[in-house]
Structure formats: C-alpha cells, structure tokens
C-alpha cells in the first residue's frame, strides 16, 4: 500500500474528526457532507444498524447522542490505517462505492467522554461523567470517506447509568486504558514491513482458532491447549472485552474468564468473514458484519440457551510486541446478538422503568 495514500487517508479522517467534534449543532450535517461522499453509508451497533445518507446519520445517531451527553469529547488511544486483501473478507457490503484493493481503511479507538445530562435511548442520565468505549472505521476513496462503521459499548453505558441488563460478568469492569506502551496513535509513517508482521501474526492467530473450531465440530472437544495460544500470545496478554464479559489478564485467566465460556457455551459457530482487516506498525484490527454466527447452548453471559442462531458483530484491535500479541481490545454488539434471540435489552429496561408496557 502506497504510504502517500495511507497518510492522505489519515489526514482526511483527522480533519473530519476535528471539524465534526467542534461543529455546532446546526453545522454537523454540512461538516459531514464536506468530508464524505454523496452516497455515504454508515454502520452502527444495535439499535442503529445500517444508515444511508447524511441526514439519517446525524438525526438518528449523532444529534441525540450529543444532546444527551454534554461537552462530548473524543479521547483516542489507537489510530492506524491500512489497505486490505479482498480475499480475507466477507462479500462486498451494501455500498454505492465498490470495494477495491486500493481502498484505505482508517481505524480509531478510544473513549468518548462527557456529562450524561439527558436521556439517551431512554437510558436515564446520572448527571456525572460518562465514558463511552468506541472503535470507528472509515473507508476512504478518492480523498473522501465513503463509509463508516462505529461501534460503542452500549451495555457499558447502561451499567454506568445504573441499568444492569445482564448477570454478573466473568471478567473485570473498569475504564480500559490505551496501549501499555502509549504509542498507539500512528499519525506518521511506519515501516510497511512492521505492519506486514502484525497482520501475518493476526492471520495466524485467526487460523489457529479456525482449526480449533473445526476440531470442536468433529470431536465435540472445545478445549484449546494453552500451548496453542502461547504460539501467538504473550503469557501476560491483556484482553479488554465488552461489558457483560469484562477484561482479563494472562493466558490462564483469559481462558477461564472468556475463552472457555465462549467456546463451551456457544455452538454451531460459523465464521462469516471480515469487512476490513488491516495493520500498521505494531497495531492491527478488524471488524465483521457479522463476523460470527452461533447458537447459545446455555451459560454464556450467565443466560440460558436458545435454539435460535444469532449474529455477532465483533471488533478487535491488537497490539503486537515482538513476535507475539500483547493486548487486545474487543467490542461485541451483544445487544444485537441478544435481540436475535428475543431479548431486547433496551425494551426490557424501558419496561422496568415504566416507560413501556409489556402488552
């Protein structure tokens, strides 16, 4: 991938973020139009899903959020760009800007922070600081953003506001830090060979999981030896999972607090591919729409099983340290996955708050 193209795409996304974050309420649509294609498309977590057109994105997502969370500021921890091989990914998404091997994707990860002063999605405000985990992807074509995908941890927002839609989680809950090395904002050029190393390592890790899934289908053995993980992960790895699962530290605790509940309590797993998977320097990322389809057999998230297959839209951001992965930030659109099984966490919250009736 041409470094000039990567840097130009980064500059476009940074310019957009700066202008949009400082735009007045009346200027948000004009700023979005300035930096994006006319047929701009947007993907978001439940309950927003896929939106087309600038007005829809502003009126359905951004304006309600910014009205509810006063003084909203963006606090990025990771920023990278890269091209991608179409062979790695799912079929072309519903976009009027067709995919190309020359496209550049830009990823930014961090927290939105502000004061939760008004209801959002009927989540009651607590009038205190709110930290919203986010990962945002932009596909840049001809120096304009053709499509975006924004994932936030909605269940974390609910829990910070005193709403608890899920049983106690297996991992820890806190405001997750950025990279231990504090070098995740890749504004300048980085040697292409380092990004290649990172992507190859991520691909090898994904391939190991695919083989484990196939073995489980053939033998019903969902266990994965820690020695298998240790070929691609440092022993003191950190996994920052979504609220409802939580964060975990070291390979041993990762297996017991996330991997085994995930592997043993979810069946019929089908990998659907990734929309984008790329790396730059020591950092890499991907997201799918959905990445994975599975069926809850009982126990995952502390919930009962279901006979209904459900889709997981998953974001992963990685940091490589040497020849192994050291940190992994993950957002899963769990509310969407749950809604496909008949549990709408926002509807249930509204019912409990007396804002919506059961019939």
Language-model segments: residues:
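C-terminal and inter-domain tail/linker signature
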Residues: 1-359
């Amino acid at each position: 991938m041409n470094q000039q193209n990567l840097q130009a795409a980064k500059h476009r996304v940074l310019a957009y973020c700066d202008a949009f974050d400082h735009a007045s309420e009346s200027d948000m649509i004009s700023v979005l139009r300035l930096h994006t294609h006319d047929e701009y498309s947007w993907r978001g977590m439940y309950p927003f899903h896929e939106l087309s057109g600038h007005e829809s994105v502003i009126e359905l997502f951004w304006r309600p959020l910014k009205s509810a969370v006063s003084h909203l500021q963006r606090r990025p921890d990771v920023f990278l760009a890269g091209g991608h091989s179409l062979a790695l990914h799912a079929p072309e998404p519903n976009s009027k800007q067709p995919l190309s091997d020359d496209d550049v994707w830009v990823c930014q990860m961090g927290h939105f922070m502000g004061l939760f002063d008004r209801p959002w999605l009927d989540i009651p405000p607590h009038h205190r600081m709110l930290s919203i985990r986010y990962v945002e992807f932009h596909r840049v074509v001809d120096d304009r953003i053709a499509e975006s995908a924004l994932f936030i941890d909605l269940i974390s927002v609910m829990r910070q506001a005193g709403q608890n839609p899920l049983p106690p989680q297996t991992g820890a809950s806190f405001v997750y830090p950025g990279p231990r090395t504090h070098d995740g904002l890749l504004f300048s050029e980085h040697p292409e060979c380092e990004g290649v190393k990172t992507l190859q390592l991520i691909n090898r890790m994904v391939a190991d999981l695919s083989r484990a899934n196939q073995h489980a289908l053939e033998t019903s053995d969902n266990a994965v030896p820690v020695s298998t993980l240790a070929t691609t992960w440092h022993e003191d790895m950190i996994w920052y999972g979504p609220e409802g699962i939580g964060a975990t530290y070291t390979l041993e605790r990762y297996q017991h607090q996330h991997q085994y509940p995930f592997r043993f309590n979810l069946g019929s797993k089908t990998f659907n591919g990734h929309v984008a998977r790329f790396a730059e320097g020591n950092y890499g990322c991907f997201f799918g729409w959905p990445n994975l389809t599975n069926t809850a057999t009982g126990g995952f998230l502390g919930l009962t099983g279901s006979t209904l297959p459900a889709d997981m839209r998953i974001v992963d951001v990685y940091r490589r340290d040497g020849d192994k992965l050291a940190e992994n930030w993950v957002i899963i659109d769990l509310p969407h996955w749950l809604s496909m099984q008949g549990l709408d966490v926002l509807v249930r919250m509204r019912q409990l708050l007396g804002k919506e009736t059961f019939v």
